[in-house]
Curated annotation (Swiss-Prot):
NCBIfam families: S18. This is Small ribosomal subunit protein bS18. Binds as a heterodimer with protein bS6 to the central domain of the 16S rRNA, where it helps stabilize the platform of the 30S subunit. It comes from the Bacteria.
Length: 90
């Protein structure tokens, strides 16, 4: 077996990484929202990528209960042509 020498010491991620990310939190829980409305397009656009995909909860920090409501609201808004299914193909 090959021996590659001493292992490098692990550095602490939070202190030395210049791209430290904030802790994720659920916007809907913090605002006290009970139900997500499909007509609130400004909120829905924050959770849709430029190419039309819904951003997953592990990236946004949204709780599972609200992520399901968000998914349904985005799909309803798409069906009613309030939101596009995909990006603009100019």
């Amino acid at each position: 077996m090959a021996f590659f020498g001493k292992r490098k010491e692990k550095r602490k991620f939070t202190q030395q990484n210049p791209l430290f990310k904030r802790r994720k939190f659920c916007r809907f829980t913090a605002a006290g929202v009970e139900e997500i409305d499909y007509k609130d397009l400004d909120t829905l656009r924050d959770f849709v990528q430029e190419n039309g995909k819904i951003i997953p909860a592990r990236l946004t920090g949204t709780k599972a209960h609200y992520q399901r409501q968000l998914d349904t609201a985005i799909k309803r808004a798409r069906f009613l042509a309030l939101l596009p299914y995909t990006d603009n193909h100019n």
